[in-house]
């Protein structure tokens, strides 16, 4: 028996503007913001109004399509110059999320051979829509594959928000919860609150409750105790960048969970599309880790909680070594074991 599941969306194309779900306002209010310039798109990404690697790539693609419609030049060479400038500009918004650069490169390549501005504008809009549509199909496929790792009644721990609002639809790490709901397979999510921005507490709990999926919120430092006492069967997380050997960059605190999974002998899965892989980098040591503003740590909802002037280290991501990962779940299936060989083989088959 199948069930219709309500799944919120984060990015919508309006033809002359982009509507984005302001994730910074959740769960208190559901507000959509209209973006009409490339600068507004950049700021929306930086301010985490749009977040999640696939969603960032989608909004960047739409942002470039939008910007191209505003160029006043009549010459294709000048058009390309302005477009490349905007591509480079958007690339400075979130350096760790590889989907951002994947989407930018795909948009750039789509008009390499185009000779008229009107045709270029048309192709850019079509390509951005295609990126969004493909991501929805990819996320559903990830969910189908991930669901084979779990059984009815499983308790599954996750961190941050790798759900529908971080992608076109369904999400990556949360996709099996949605697909399971559709198919009558009950999965119970345990969501780490995810300091300092609380994506787990604000976003994962919100979207799963919207869909009627069981979710229990825990503080980040409860994870070990929860695994020990709540019969956690597995851990599943998303990814912002996976390199050639399987080392994975994801929200800060992810490696903590991988170490706990190893200690308690439960599976630790990474769920991500092929667009999140960066096979130009051989190990996680090559990944640039974004460091964010100290006020994310020293203030909570605008209120100072640490002495003024306190030194803060606030990396947005950490890198989980491949040896701690049970399997990487992609739209093409689940890879495990010799990640360097399996990832290379996967990309050979898709090239």
Swiss-Prot record:
Its EC number is 5.3.1.23. The keyword Disulfide bond does not apply. InterPro entries: IF-2B-related, IF-M1Pi, IF_2B-like_C, Initiation_fac_2B_a/b/d, M1Pi_N, NagB/RpiA_transferase-like. The record marks 160 as: Transition state stabilizer. It catalyses: 5-(methylsulfanyl)-alpha-D-ribose 1-phosphate = 5-(methylsulfanyl)-D-ribulose 1-phosphate. One of its GO terms (molecular function) is S-methyl-5-thioribose-1-phosphate isomerase activity. Substrate binds at residues 51-53, 94, 199, 250-251. Homodimer. Catalyzes the interconversion of methylthioribose-1-phosphate (MTR-1-P) into methylthioribulose-1-phosphate (MTRu-1-P). Belongs to the EIF-2B alpha/beta/delta subunits family. MtnA subfamily. This is Methylthioribose-1-phosphate isomerase. The gene is mtnA.
